[in-house]
Structure formats: C-alpha cells, structure tokens
Amino acid sequence: MMNLNKLLAVMVIVFPMTIAAFEVTGDHFKDTFKITSVTAHEDGTSFNAESDSAGQYGKVYLTYNLKSSNSSRNSGTWIGYGRGISPEGNLAIGNLMGVWTRDGSIISIKSLDEVTDGINFMQGTMDLISGE
C-alpha cells in the first residue's frame, strides 16, 4: 500500500509538468477563410467557409457545426469536416473537432483535426459581422 501511495504522489507531481511542456511544432500557415453560409438549427449553428490558399492544402472548404454548452450561448463544442485540393491535384480530407467561445460577434475556435496527412492543431477566430 505504501508503494502505491508513493507512485500516486510521483504521478501528481510529474503529470502537470508534462502537460506544461506541450509544444506545437511542425509546418504551419496563416490564412483567412470567408464564411459562405450560415444555417441556424434548434441545437446549434452551422458555418460553411472556404479559402483559396490554405497552405499545403490549397483550395479548402470547411463546415463547422457549433453546439452551445450553456444557456448564454457563449461557448461550446463543435465538429466539422474539411476538404482541400492542392494545385497539384492532391486531395486532403479532414475530420475536425474542438471547442469554441464567443465574445460579442467574435467566435474563437480551437481544434485537433485528423487530416489525410496527420494530426493538426488549429486555432482561429470568426467575425460574424465581417464574415471572416
């Protein structure tokens, strides 16, 4: 029993340090997506967006399905789907999932996405007034 207590104590100390050491590395790009349509549902809102030059993915089409987690509708979770076609004709397909918050007309999103070429971390904002 004493060894189990020691093991738990070590895990409590080491685990938070491991989380703090997380770093995102690898290829990255910045881009602006234009919201092309918005659909309101009883349990959430769907956004379709596109970009002509999303890094190695080229022309990209996205769908975000946002669901609120509280009555004030200022945060929640979302799932989505993406399709990209590079200038060389390479097709990329993505399953997207993350969290969102809203401050006025700005929605901030973060996600971990499973894409044809691996796992991607994404963060960005959507301005509901400008559509970008």
Model-derived features: positions:
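Bacterial N-terminal signal peptides
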Residues: L8-T18
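Bacterial N-terminal signal peptides that target proteins for export
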Residues: M1-L8
